[in-house]
Amino acid sequence: KTGVIRFIGATEFSPGPWVGVELDKAGGKNDGSVSGVRYFACKPRFGSFVRPDKVKI
């Protein structure tokens, strides 16, 4: 999947670093928020959070 990095850092939903990605196509699990906490803004199902080692630039 491809997209734009919109967030890098710690989150409230899980320990450790995360990368928030706005996907080019729907297929994500969120809109940039998780459990009511907004990390970045995008359309529903276009947001995804992945571990940094899963990101290719």
Q: For the regions a protein language model found, what residue spans apply to each?
A:
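Ser/Thr/Pro-rich, acidic low-complexity intrinsically disordered regulatory segments
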Residues: K1-I57
